[in-house]
Regions:
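N-terminal, positively charged/glycine-rich alpha-helical extensions of SAM-dependent methyltransferases
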Residues: 1-20
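C-terminal alpha-helical "lid/dimerization" subdomain adjacent to the S-adenosyl-L-methionine
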Residues: 7, 11, 28-30, 146-204
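Conserved alpha-helix/loop element of class I SAM-dependent methyltransferases that forms part
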Residues: 30-48
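Class I SAM-dependent methyltransferase SAM/SAH-binding core
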Residues: 51, 55-105
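A short acidic, Gly/Pro-enriched loop at the edge of an enzyme's catalytic core
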Residues: 104-115
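A short SAM/SAH-binding and catalytic strip from SAM-dependent methyltransferases
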Residues: 115-127
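A short glycine-rich, Lys/Arg-flanked "PGG" loop and its adjoining helix->strand segment in the class I
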Residues: 129-141
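Core SAM-dependent methyltransferase catalytic element
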Residues: 188-189, 193-232, 236-240
Length: 240
């Protein structure tokens, strides 16, 4: 990871989400609801095995279609306890397992899942580039990797505020300054769609398709994202 980015370690992440676990559903969980619903709606049109990285308290689990087999992982045991309670209470038989696991070292074989989703995760993990490569690794050819995340702005009031928050990453549990270029590193993942999400474009969905041998030119995807960030446009397919 570049030394230009504030670094959070795994211990800091665990500690932050130990504090968040009791109140997460009623705080950030509400803010993130629109993005979560949008991602799951897309996933429900697909088939097969789904891996949710950073499943947290399991807010998304009841929304997955019963035709899908869902596995969730998270670094926080306290968050996973909340997720397991939801699975038991709602009798979610399509949830195959919930595991305490580091997203940068997934304990699954290559090409194990048809869809891999990480919602509000990449700004939390200590090494997002390593996590991105793990998402690519466990996704099957033709499968999709879906991110919902906050990406920072370089200019304006929001950009100023994000830069002021940057030194407090360990305390708040996430990177306020996070450039989209950090997830555009996998040559076999073609960026197929970008969608700004509520509230007011604070979050963005990126949908990738795994196409081994495609050798995506990262600069093309970066140019597309730069255009979208400037214009604040709605859903757009990314030209391949």
């Amino acid at each position: 990871m570049s030394s230009n980015h504030p670094v959070m370690d795994t211990k800091s992440v665990r500690h932050a989400y130990r504090r968040w676990a009791p109140v997460y559903d009623y705080t950030f969980g509400q803010v993130a609801d629109a993005g979560r619903k949008h991602a799951v709606k897309i996933i429900n049109k697909r088939k097969g095995r789904v891996l949710e990285v950073g499943v947290g308290t399991g807010l998304s689990l009841p929304a997955y279609g019963k035709h899908l087999t869902v596995t969730g992982i998270d670094l926080s045991p306290e968050m996973l306890d909340k997720a397991r309670e939801k699975v038991a209470k709602k009798k979610l038989g399509n949830v195959d397992g919930l595991h305490e696991m580091d997203a940068s070292a997934l304990g699954f074989a290559d090409e194990s899942f048809d869809t891999v989703v990480a919602m509000y995760v990449m700004t939390v993990v200590p090494d997002p580039e390593k996590v991105m490569r793990e998402l690519e690794r466990v996704c099957a050819p033709g499968g999709e990797v879906i991110l919902v995340n906050h990406f920072s702005q370089e200019h304006g009031a929001r950009g100023f505020f994000e830069r002021k928050l940057a030194p407090f990453a360990d305390l708040i549990g996430w990177h306020a300054v996070f450039e989209p270029e950090r997830v555009l590193i996998c040559e076999d993942l073609r960026l197929a769609e970008r969608r700004p999400l509520w509230p007011v474009g604070l979050f963005t969905m990126l949908r990738f398709v795994k196409e081994p041998g495609f050798k995506v030119a990262p600069q093309a995807a970066r140019d597309f994202l730069a255009k979208g960030r400037k214009a604040g446009s709605a859903t757009e397919p990314v030209p391949s």
